């Protein structure tokens, strides 16, 4: 992940005044956003040093001479969004497939028209894209994510199915971590499918004997992910792949129950995985097990919308049973969504979240899904990743949908974007 200049952050002091609302996320439950009204917030370097009333913050800050000040009067402050499930590194576009499917989703129609579809279409386009071009196109997407409020993003491989192609995708994450003012958490998703013309058994051997050891040896990923579903990997196969990852120091996560329940979430609970994503067909009986195992449930409203899912994920019973929940864009060629603000709106309209629960899932929950306890909450000594939203109340982001409500993005104590623009030279 990107590391800011230490000397610069030590010298920086920032006081944000007069916010109508500060959502600290210091609460204990899914619906508690830790609201502070008429709030102030003080930052030293890259860390928050005080949050609360004017009197509390000024007392904690001490001498304020020379401190940079931002007036947030009538505005809302929240933690930066943590987009904890994306496939943002990819080549090409599947717009032709998407456009046809809007009115005629039959596979035979797409085949007759000669339109490549699905993951394997993206695999071929990504393989054919140079690392430089792949980085440039991904950077454009990540910049859009940053100005709409995402300060930490998880980014998966999974459109390669060979070691060089998967490593190329992970190298893009490394390159962009050095140039963008956001943290990129890399995930190895070699088990997104398997190489065409090869058996699944052969490919699993390649994953465990060559690909995972190499990814780990070169420190290219923090997480190891598998897509478990009918027609893809079984729970037993996923257990082997994820256990191999654990043996090489990679944290397990899983694509679970998107189109069927074949034991993926039960495995997530058994292995105490960091997170499980999709959850469209997760049985009620497994939800308490996920909660007790500390598995964060990741709901992907954009995907449910983009594919017109026949069984939209219902987060309500998960929230009610006390699972920690997260929201993410799942940005990918089949769900090209870059804004977490749109995710918030969809989550509340179609997936059973209240506005408070959605904001908490998009910040605190996303950080927990990535095992990051230093962000997603505005509290003393936490990383100063936060947003100033040009709204009177946080619910307005969900209510007044369709535009960017982020006025200011602060990353590690530094203003990095304002009014839809990153405060540095734009890419050529």
Language-model features: where?
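N-terminal metal-binding scaffold of metallo-dependent hydrolase/deaminase domains
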Residues: 1-60, 396
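Conserved beta-strand scaffold positions in the cores of enzyme catalytic domains, especially
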Residues: 15, 66-71, 186, 409
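Divalent metal-coordination and catalytic microenvironments
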Residues: 19, 41, 46, 74, ...
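Metal-associated gating/positioning segment near the N- to mid-region
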Residues: 69-137
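Metal-coordinating catalytic core of metallo-dependent amide/deamination hydrolases
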Residues: 120-139, 143, 151-262, 333
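Non-catalytic positions within long, well-ordered alpha-helices that form the structural scaffold/packing
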Residues: 146, 208, 216-217, 246, ...
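Active-site-adjacent C-terminal substructures of enzyme catalytic domains
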Residues: 251-252, 261-377, 389-391, 395, ...
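Short peripheral tails and domain-boundary helices/loops at the edges of structured domains
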Residues: 406-422
């Amino acid at each position: 992940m990107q590391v800011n200049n230490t000397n610069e952050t030590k010298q920086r002091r920032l006081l944000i005044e007069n916010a109508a609302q500060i959502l600290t996320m210091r609460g204990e439950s899914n619906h508690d956003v830790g609201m502070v009204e008429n709030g102030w917030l003080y930052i030293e370097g890259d860390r928050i040093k005080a949050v609360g009333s004017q009197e509390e913050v000024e007392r904690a800050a001490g001498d304020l001479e020379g401190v940079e000040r931002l007036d947030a009067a009538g505005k809302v402050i929240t933690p930066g969004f943590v987009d904890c499930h994306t496939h943002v590194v990819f080549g090409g576009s599947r717009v032709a497939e998407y456009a046809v499917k809007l009115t005629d989703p039959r596979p035979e129609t797409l085949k007759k028209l000669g339109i490549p579809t699905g993951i394997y279409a993206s695999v071929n386009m990504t393989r054919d894209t140079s690392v430089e071009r792949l980085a440039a196109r991904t950077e454009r997407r990540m910049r859009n994510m940053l100005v709409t409020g995402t300060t930490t993003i998880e980014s998966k491989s999974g459109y390669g199915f060979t070691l060089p192609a998967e490593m190329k995708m992970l190298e893009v994450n490394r390159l962009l971590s050095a140039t963008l003012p956001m943290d990129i958490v890399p995930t190895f998703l070699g088990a997104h499918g398997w190489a065409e013309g090869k058996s699944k058994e052969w490919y699993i051997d390649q994953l465990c004997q060559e690909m995972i050891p190499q990814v780990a040896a070169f420190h290219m990923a923090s997480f190891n992910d598998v897509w478990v579903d009918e027609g893809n990997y079984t729970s037993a196969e996923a257990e082997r792949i994820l256990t191999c990852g654990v043996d090489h120091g990679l944290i397990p996560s899983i694509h679970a129950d998107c189109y069927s329940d074949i034991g993926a979430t039960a495995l997530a609970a058994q292995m105490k995985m960091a997170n499980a994503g999709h959850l469209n067909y997760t049985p009620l009986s497994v939800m308490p097990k996920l909660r007790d195992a500390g598995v964060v449930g990741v709901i992907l409203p954009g995907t449910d919308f983009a594919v017109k899912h026949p069984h939209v994920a219902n987060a309500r019973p998960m929230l009610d049973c006390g699972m920690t929940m997260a929201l993410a864009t799942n940005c990918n060629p089949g769900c090209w969504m870059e804004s977490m603000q749109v995710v918030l709106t969809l989550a509340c309209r179609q997936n059973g979240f209240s506005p408070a629960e959605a904001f908490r899932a998009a910040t605190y929950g996303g950080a927990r899904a990535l095992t990051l306890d230093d962000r997603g909450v505005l509290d003393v000594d936490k990383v100063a990743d936060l947003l100033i939203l040009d709204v009177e109340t946080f619910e307005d982001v969900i209510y007044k949908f369709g535009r960017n409500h982020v006025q200011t993005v602060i990353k590690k104590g530094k203003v990095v974007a304002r009014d839809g623009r990153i405060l540095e030279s734009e890419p050529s």
